[in-house]
């Protein structure tokens, strides 16, 4: 890309391609969001109950909670360690990876549960992730001192396999999502089934439209943002001023940085903000 400026900051992405006309005359902007409903791991999540280890969670965005039980789940995220290093974590996506799960009642014990409304048949507090059932073995001294041996086994696994201490959960951002790749759906392969199409399908097309644009008359911009699922709040949501700041930085790099020109550039811009819509389903 000629004369391009891109910036990625964790959960947002902004890319500009300077046009032939001055930035003050406005931009053509493509926008989409890259967050999706999910389950987040809390900051002090690991606990043991009845010889089973769990991760305490809360859900992000609008989810049908009953859809998340008894399906293979993967964990994605980052851990910021005490020494300042940041480690990416993905467990559950490779064929030989273990997956996680949220348990549910078997049908023979569900008489009262199935009488509940769909919104409460699985409570938000019941979305904790089952991560282990085997107690720690091979350490006689620790086995005598430790009352929660399954939790201790998980802590040992984290240390040996991820070089992670239990305290590192405090500075971690870990997300639970359905495990598995997107796949063709239907005998005619006319559909795609996969997690996160709202709204990454629009983010994908917006990004590639930007990458395939050459020598635009007006400055082109692609902005992919976070927090849409919870109202666009926070430092990386559209309620913040980060986009205006990026435009001001670009104006300072290419022209004189006059604040009035920044406001003119925004006022003269056009934006296509894209998101998914619901398909017609005759069954409903």
Give the ranges of each region predicted by the language model.
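Acidic, glycine-rich active-site loops and adjacent beta-strand->loop/helix elements
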Residues: 34-36, 61-63, 81-83, 180-182, ...
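Metal-dependent peptidase/peptidase-like ectodomains
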Residues: 113-155, 231-284
